[in-house]
Regions:
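Sec-dependent signal peptide recognition
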Residues: 1-10
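Hydrophobic h-region of N-terminal signal peptides that target proteins for export
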Residues: 10-18
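Low-complexity, Pro/Ser/Thr- and charge-rich linker/hinge segments at domain boundaries
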Residues: 23, 101-137
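Ligand-binding face of N-terminal immunoglobulin V-set domains in extracellular IgSF glycoproteins
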Residues: 24-108
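Catalytic cores of eukaryotic secretory-pathway lumenal/extracellular enzymes that build
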Residues: 52-54, 60, 69, 117, ...
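Extended ligand-binding groove/face enriched in aromatic
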Residues: 120-184, 206-250
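Extended, Lys/Arg-rich, non-catalytic nucleic-acid recognition/anchoring regions
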Residues: 188
Length: 250
């Protein structure tokens, strides 16, 4: 029996819950207690909705639709539901037209998302093993040391001619391939710098279990530095220009 089915069975004696719904759209991560709480239902036929406490099975809120939004490009309408009046932390079900969907209210509700977003960069590291201590089942051997890289004819200059061998280890894989891009990763670093400048206290506290965790430097800065070191190797010392990418030949 899966978790969803179990919850429905436990609460069945108090409240008849509907089927898990793909019609109802809400914040899957949850809501802060004092935050606005809105859901969207992919139909214009909603007369009432109910919020049920998952722990007790009690109805804690019933409301009418806020408004119906008609699509300018189709004959479909969507109903907006507002349940911002619920502020108590806990797990709940939103019930609409016989369907239901679970959600949570708690402080720091988006912290898991922030942690996962930062940790994803560690998984993209090249040139070092991604160890089970930090990656669990996503561990893997080191990929692409990039300590012997050939300058492509399109990137050759007066000093560094085509075929020159350089070392350019580290950095992040761009996506599902083996390429490393200056522009793409520099954009990511720019966002990291901007958000750290705005919320330094948050990132001083954040720990996402990477090899550098606990070194008295925020994990965000450590992860950013891992790619910055690689970016420095992508600069042509003769003219200061920066190569666009490091990639396989084909």
């Amino acid at each position: 029996m899966n978790i969803t089915t179990c919850l429905f069975t436990v609460l069945g004696g108090m409240v008849t819950l509907g089927h898990p719904s793909e019609t109802i759209r809400l914040n899957q991560l949850g809501y802060y207690p004092q935050q606005e709480k809105v859901a969207v239902v992919n139909t214009g036929e909603v007369r009432e909705f109910t919020i049920v406490d998952a722990a007790t099975g009690n109805r804690v809120f019933s409301g009418k639709p806020g408004y119906i939004a008609s699509s300018a490009w189709s004959d479909k309408s969507r109903t907006i539901l507002d349940f911002s009046d619920i502020t108590a932390p806990g797990n709940y079900f939103l019930m609409v037209n016989g369907d239901s969907v679970a959600f949570e209210i708690k402080e720091r509700v988006l912290s898991p998302l922030a942690d996962a977003a930062l940790k994803s960069f560690y998984y993209q590291r090249t040139g070092m093993p991604i160890e089970a201590t930090y990656a669990g089942r996503w561990s893997r051997p080191a990929g692409h040391p990039d300590d012997k890289v050939l300058i492509h004819p399109n990137a050759a200059g007066p000093e560094r001619k085509a075929g020159t061998v350089i070392s350019s280890p580290g950095g992040w894989y761009d996506a599902g391939d083996y390429n490393k891009y200056i522009v793409n990763s520099a954009y990511s670093i720019g966002l990291m710098q901007a958000i750290y400048a705005r919320f330094p206290d948050y990132f001083i506290r954040q720990q996402v279990n990477i090899p550098e965790s606990g070194n008295h430097t925020p994990d965000l800065l450590d992860e950013m530095y891992y790619n910055l070191r690689w970016m420095l190797t992508m600069q042509d010392p003769a003219d200061g220009g920066v190569y666009h990418k490091l990639t396989t030949f084909q």
